[in-house]
From Swiss-Prot:
Keyword Glycoprotein: no
GO biological processes: ribosomal large subunit assembly; translation
CDD domains recorded: Ribosomal_L20
Function: Binds directly to 23S ribosomal RNA and is necessary for the in vitro assembly process of the 50S ribosomal subunit. It is not involved in the protein synthesizing functions of that subunit.
A GO cellular component annotation in the UniProt record: ribonucleoprotein complex
Family indicated by similarity: Belongs to the bacterial ribosomal protein bL20 family.
Name by which UniProt lists this protein: Large ribosomal subunit protein bL20
Protein's organism: Methylocella silvestris (strain DSM 15510 / CIP 108128 / LMG 27833 / NCIMB 13906 / BL2)
Highest taxon listed in the record's lineage: Bacteria
GO molecular function, one term: structural constituent of ribosome
Keywords: Ribonucleoprotein, Ribosomal protein, RNA-binding, rRNA-binding
A Pfam family annotated for this UniProt entry: Ribosomal_L20
Gene3D superfamilies, per database record: 6.10.160.10, Ribosomal protein L20 (1.10.1900.20)
Protein backbone atom coordinates (compact mmCIF):
# COMPACT_ATOMS: atom_id res chain seq x y z
CA UNK A 1 0.00 0.00 0.00
CA UNK A 2 1.29 3.46 -0.88
CA UNK A 3 2.23 5.95 1.83
CA UNK A 4 -0.01 9.01 2.12
CA UNK A 5 1.94 12.18 2.92
CA UNK A 6 -0.94 14.68 3.26
CA UNK A 7 0.83 17.40 1.29
CA UNK A 8 -2.24 18.15 -0.78
CA UNK A 9 -4.47 18.29 2.30
CA UNK A 10 -2.23 20.66 4.25
CA UNK A 11 -1.78 22.87 1.18
CA UNK A 12 -5.56 23.10 0.80
CA UNK A 13 -5.98 23.95 4.51
CA UNK A 14 -3.30 26.63 4.31
CA UNK A 15 -4.85 28.08 1.18
CA UNK A 16 -8.26 28.19 2.88
CA UNK A 17 -6.76 29.98 5.91
CA UNK A 18 -4.97 32.54 3.75
CA UNK A 19 -8.18 33.18 1.78
CA UNK A 20 -9.98 33.90 5.04
CA UNK A 21 -7.13 36.24 6.11
CA UNK A 22 -7.35 38.29 2.92
CA UNK A 23 -7.38 41.98 3.76
CA UNK A 24 -5.64 41.58 7.12
CA UNK A 25 -2.71 43.87 7.95
CA UNK A 26 0.96 42.89 7.95
CA UNK A 27 2.20 39.31 8.32
CA UNK A 28 -1.19 38.03 9.31
CA UNK A 29 -2.33 38.12 5.68
CA UNK A 30 0.47 35.99 4.20
CA UNK A 31 2.13 33.89 6.94
CA UNK A 32 0.28 30.67 7.73
CA UNK A 33 0.97 30.71 11.46
CA UNK A 34 0.00 34.34 12.00
CA UNK A 35 -2.95 34.07 9.62
CA UNK A 36 -4.36 31.04 11.43
CA UNK A 37 -4.25 32.83 14.79
CA UNK A 38 -5.83 35.96 13.31
CA UNK A 39 -8.57 34.01 11.50
CA UNK A 40 -9.38 31.99 14.63
CA UNK A 41 -9.70 35.19 16.65
CA UNK A 42 -11.80 36.84 13.94
CA UNK A 43 -14.20 33.89 14.02
CA UNK A 44 -14.51 34.26 17.81
CA UNK A 45 -15.29 37.95 17.37
CA UNK A 46 -17.82 37.17 14.63
CA UNK A 47 -19.62 34.62 16.82
CA UNK A 48 -19.68 36.98 19.82
CA UNK A 49 -20.86 39.94 17.78
CA UNK A 50 -23.65 38.06 15.99
CA UNK A 51 -25.23 37.68 19.42
CA UNK A 52 -24.36 41.20 20.56
CA UNK A 53 -25.89 42.65 17.39
CA UNK A 54 -29.35 41.54 18.50
CA UNK A 55 -28.96 43.33 21.85
CA UNK A 56 -27.58 46.47 20.21
CA UNK A 57 -30.45 46.74 17.73
CA UNK A 58 -33.09 46.17 20.40
CA UNK A 59 -31.52 48.96 22.48
CA UNK A 60 -31.54 51.24 19.42
CA UNK A 61 -35.24 50.55 18.77
CA UNK A 62 -36.06 51.28 22.41
CA UNK A 63 -34.13 54.58 22.32
CA UNK A 64 -35.94 55.63 19.15
CA UNK A 65 -39.30 54.68 20.60
CA UNK A 66 -38.61 56.53 23.84
CA UNK A 67 -37.73 59.70 21.91
CA UNK A 68 -40.78 59.43 19.64
CA UNK A 69 -43.19 58.63 22.48
CA UNK A 70 -41.92 61.49 24.66
CA UNK A 71 -42.90 63.90 21.87
CA UNK A 72 -46.45 62.59 22.35
CA UNK A 73 -46.37 63.10 26.12
CA UNK A 74 -45.69 59.54 27.31
CA UNK A 75 -42.67 57.62 28.56
CA UNK A 76 -41.46 54.41 26.94
CA UNK A 77 -42.47 52.18 29.86
CA UNK A 78 -45.98 53.66 30.07
CA UNK A 79 -46.30 53.31 26.28
CA UNK A 80 -45.39 49.61 26.36
CA UNK A 81 -47.77 49.08 29.29
CA UNK A 82 -50.53 50.84 27.34
CA UNK A 83 -49.89 48.68 24.27
CA UNK A 84 -50.12 45.52 26.36
CA UNK A 85 -53.39 46.66 27.97
CA UNK A 86 -54.82 47.69 24.58
CA UNK A 87 -53.91 44.28 23.13
CA UNK A 88 -51.68 45.71 20.41
CA UNK A 89 -49.13 43.05 19.44
CA UNK A 90 -46.58 44.99 17.40
CA UNK A 91 -42.90 44.49 18.13
CA UNK A 92 -40.36 47.20 18.90
CA UNK A 93 -38.65 46.92 15.51
CA UNK A 94 -41.86 47.67 13.61
CA UNK A 95 -42.87 50.42 16.05
CA UNK A 96 -39.47 52.08 15.67
CA UNK A 97 -39.72 51.91 11.89
CA UNK A 98 -43.25 53.36 12.00
CA UNK A 99 -42.10 56.23 14.22
CA UNK A 100 -39.52 57.20 11.59
CA UNK A 101 -41.30 56.50 8.30
CA UNK A 102 -44.99 57.04 9.15
CA UNK A 103 -45.35 59.42 12.11
CA UNK A 104 -49.13 59.78 11.71
CA UNK A 105 -49.68 56.01 11.95
CA UNK A 106 -47.36 55.89 14.96
CA UNK A 107 -49.32 58.72 16.59
CA UNK A 108 -52.52 56.68 16.17
CA UNK A 109 -50.88 53.73 17.95
CA UNK A 110 -49.69 56.03 20.75
CA UNK A 111 -53.23 57.40 21.15
CA UNK A 112 -54.58 53.85 21.35
CA UNK A 113 -52.01 53.02 24.05
CA UNK A 114 -52.86 56.24 25.92
CA UNK A 115 -56.57 55.43 25.92
CA UNK A 116 -55.88 51.98 27.43
CA UNK A 117 -53.97 53.52 30.35
CA UNK A 118 -55.79 54.67 33.49
CA UNK A 119 -56.02 58.47 33.73
Amino acid sequence: MARVKRGVTSHAKHKKTLEAAKGFYGRRKNTIRAAKAAVDRSMQYATRDRRAKKRVFRALWIQRLNAAVRECGLTYSRFIDGLAKAGVAVDRKVLSDLAITQPEAFKAIVDKAKSALPA
